[in-house]
A protein has these predicted regions:
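Short gly/ser-rich loop at a beta-strand->alpha-helix junction or flexible surface loop bordering the NTP-binding
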Residues: 2-180
Length: 180
């Protein structure tokens, strides 16, 4: 049993709590900026499945030079701004493939991964093979049935349609002048 005389009441200034909170925020900020910088040096987008990281990053999008080009994919804004549309598309595709390992790509997305030239104005919504993944049509993706895709291959760790199937898909969908 504790007696009232055993309890010591101390007054602690509010600045101690503010300092601890600020230190914790600075450590989190430095850690996330270091991860974003490392991802930029590797030429990829930062992909996170961690809810705490995701919440921190989303709170700082638009500030701290952080961008979220696609859901769950992050980078430093100045690095993103310096990329060409082709580089942006490639990083986005690779990031989506890392976040969704069951996804496979076709059309212009697969062409980029195969190293084919794709005009900037043909880059846009993602081209996904419907592989049992839960992609909604509202996400702007163009879906292809698996039986139409044929056997899938891996290029740079990303599942894509075979090379000649990719060429055929692109030629069938591109304006005539691009097909030449």
């Amino acid at each position: 049993m504790a007696h009232l005389s055993d309890v010591v009441v101390m007054e602690v200034s509010n600045t101690v709590f503010k300092h601890r909170h600020a230190t914790r925020n600075t450590l989190a900020r430095n850690r996330m900026l270091a991860r974003l910088t490392e991802a930029a040096e590797l030429g990829v987008l930062l992909v996170t499945h961690d809810n705490a990281e995701l919440m921190w990053l989303r709170r700082h999008v638009g500030t701290d030079d952080i961008a979220e080009p696609e859901p769950y994919l992050f980078c430093l804004q100045h690095d993103w701004d310096a990329l060409t549309p082709t580089e942006r598309a490639l990083r986005t595709i690779k990031g989506l493939a890392e976040f969704h390992p069951d996804w496979a790509f076709w059309g212009y997305d697969a062409a980029l991964l195969w190293g084919l030239e794709v005009p900037n104005d043909l880059l846009g919504p993602r081209f996904l093979v419907k592989t049992g993944c839960s992609v909604t049509l509202s996400s702007g993706c163009r879906l292809l049935r698996p039986q139409m895709a044929g056997a899938l291959e891996r290029v740079d760790g990303v599942r894509v349609t075979p090379f000649w199937r990719t060429v055929e898909d692109c030629l069938l969908r591109a304006p005539f002048s691009y097909g030449l």
